[in-house]
Amino acid sequence: VGLAKGLRKVGTIYPLVVAVLPDVPPEHRRILVEQGCVVREIEPVYPPENHTEFAMAYYVINYSKLRIWEFVEYSKMIYLDGDIQVFENIDHLFDLENGYFYAVMDCFCEKTWSHTPQYQIGYCQQSPKRVHWPKQLGPKPPLYFNAGMFVYEPSLPTYHDLLHTLKITPPTPFAEQDFLNMFLRDVYRPIPNVYNLVLAMLWRHPENVNLEAVKVVHYCAAGSKPWRYTGEEENMDRNDIKMLVNKWRDIYDDEMLDYNAVADPAADGLQLTAVLTEAAGVVRFIPAPSAA
C-alpha cells in the first residue's frame, strides 16, 4: 500500500502489477484492491532440499520471485521489494537497452555477509580500492547485485531455464539473490545506487551516497522498516535514517494519495496493479506490443 501511494505521488505513467502467494489472506487482498491494486496469485517456488542455513530464515520463500519471468504479456518489468519506496519518478528505466538485466550493486560490509571471503578480508565492490582483492584467492568475484530492485524482460525460455537450473543448484545463504547473480552474470549491467539505496551504504560508504539525488530507498537494514521502526537497533538513531523513515510514513499517512482520493486515475496514468508476495515483492510493467 505504501509503495502504491508512493508511485501515485511521483506520477508514474505506467501501471504496477503484483502477485500474491496462495496463503495471503482475503482481507489483505481486499485492502490491496481498495488501493487500486490488481492481485495476481502465483504458486511458491522452493529450492532443492538441503541443510543450507539462509542469512535470514524467510529468504527461502524468496525463490517465488522467479515466477515473474513467466509474465510474458509484458515486454519489460521493474521489480521492487515491498520494503522499498520510490521518491522520484523512475519511468525512464523502461527505456534501457533490451537484452540486459539491470540492478544496483550490493554492499558486502554488513554482518549478514560474514560467511563470504569478501567480508572476511574487508573487500567491497562499492570501494574496491580500499582493500584490494588478494591474488591468492584467485580471480576477483564478478559484480554482484542486490535483487530488491531490478529491470528485466519476461521470457518463457528464461523462466523454464531458471526453474531447471534451480533444481540442480545447491541453495546458498542469500537464496534467490545468489542464484540470480549466478544465472544472470553474463547479462547483468549495473545502474547507479540512486535506484536502490541499500541503507548500509549510509554508514559503510557515505562517500558514494548523494541523498538529495536518491530516487529509490530500500529499507532492508535491521530495524529500518518504517512500519515497525523504533530507532533502537544499531545505526537506526542516525538523523538520515530518521529522515528517510519519516518520508515513508508521510506518504503512507497521506490520505490524498489513497486510490479513492484520485478523482480520475486514468487521466493521471495511475491505474495501479500490485502483487504482494510473502517475499513482499511488487512489479511495474510495460505491456507487450499487441499482435496486431
Swiss-Prot record:
Residue positions binding Mn(2+): D81, D83, H218
Active-site residue numbers: K65
Keyword line: Carbohydrate metabolism, Cytoplasm, Galactose metabolism, Glycosyltransferase, Manganese, Metal-binding, Transferase
Keyword RNA-binding: no
Tissue specificity comment: Present in phloem-associated intermediary cells. Weakly expressed in leaves.
InterPro entries the record matches: Glyco_trans_8, GNT1/Glycosyltrans_8, Nucleotide-diphossugar_trans
One GO term of the biological process aspect: cellular response to cold
Pfam entry (one): Glyco_transf_8
GO cellular component, one term: cytoplasm
PANTHER family hit by this protein: GLYCOGENIN SUBFAMILY MEMBER
This protein's name: Galactinol synthase 2
Record organism: Ajuga reptans
Taxonomic lineage from the root: Eukaryota, Viridiplantae, Streptophyta, Embryophyta, Tracheophyta
Gene designation per UniProt: GOLS2
